[in-house]
């Protein structure tokens, strides 16, 4: 999959744009240290935007019927994304909980893969959180879904307000976890427990 995406970008156009950007900021793209920079940056962005054109729900290829009706939580799923407003990174951890319906569960790695696909594109943290939850709901139709994303945004660290270490936390709840405050609080306490 990764190789397909890397080959599908318009490398020439991306490299030319990066070359022009270097000129626009007053750099000489032909100096020794920058000679291969347009090529390297185009390749890096091909990797960073690997999720474009993909649907996170398609990552749920393994669905099993199990005698498990209690909450499933996978926490501390590391991710990196690019803020669509400033094109600088934001990164952190995603925590996903779902309450199976009719014993339908998925492979645990599929949750991490859905995070990977949803984060590998120009993104907003709020949308990322919702896209992960919606993908899980569409794939498994669980009784409840809760997604929490904690991230540090370089657009707040490197520029503007310049507040390194500040974290943004977003949550999205579906089904039972949206309807029941008590159920939601119980899952959030498990997600945030060390």
UniProtKB/Swiss-Prot annotation:
Binding site for Zn(2+): 83, 86, 155
Transmembrane spans: none
Signal sequence, renumbered to the chain: none
Entry EC no(s): 3.5.4.16
Enzyme class name: hydrolase
Family of the protein in this entry: Belongs to the GTP cyclohydrolase I family.
Keywords of the record: GTP-binding, Hydrolase, Metal-binding, Nucleotide-binding, One-carbon metabolism, Zinc
Assembly description: Toroid-shaped homodecamer, composed of two pentamers of five dimers.
Single GO molecular function: GTP cyclohydrolase I activity
Name the UniProt record assigns to this protein: GTP cyclohydrolase 1
Entry superkingdom: Bacteria
Annotated catalysed reactions: GTP + H2O = 7,8-dihydroneopterin 3'-triphosphate + formate + H(+)
Pfam families (alphabetical): GTP_cyclohydroI (PF01227)
InterPro entries on file: GTP-CH-I_C/QueF, GTP-CH-I_N, GTP_CycHdrlase_I, GTP_CycHdrlase_I_CS, GTP_CycHdrlase_I_dom
């Amino acid at each position: 999959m990764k190789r397909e995406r890397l080959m599908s970008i318009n490398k020439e156009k991306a490299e030319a744009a990066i070359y022009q950007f270097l000129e626009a900021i007053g750099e000489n793209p032909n100096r020794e240290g920058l000679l291969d920079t347009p090529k390297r940056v185009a390749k890096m962005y091909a990797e960073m935007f690997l999720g474009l054109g993909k649907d996170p729900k398609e990552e749920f290829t393994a669905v099993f019927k199990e005698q498990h009706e209690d909450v499933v939580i996978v926490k501390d799923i590391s991710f990196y994304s690019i803020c669509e407003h400033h094109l600088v990174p934001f990164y952190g951890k995603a925590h996903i909980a779902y309450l199976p319906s009719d014993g339908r569960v998925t492979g645990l790695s599929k949750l991490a893969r859905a995070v990977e696909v949803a984060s590998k594109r120009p993104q907003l943290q709020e949308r990322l959180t919702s896209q992960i939850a919606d993908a899980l709901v569409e794939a498994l139709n669980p009784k409840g879904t809760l997604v929490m994303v904690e991230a540090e945004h370089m657009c707040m660290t490197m520029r503007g307000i310049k507040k390194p270490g500040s974290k943004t936390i977003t949550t999205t709840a579906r089904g039972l976890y949206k309807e029941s405050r008590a159920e939601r609080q119980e899952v959030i306490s498990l997600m945030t427990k060390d």
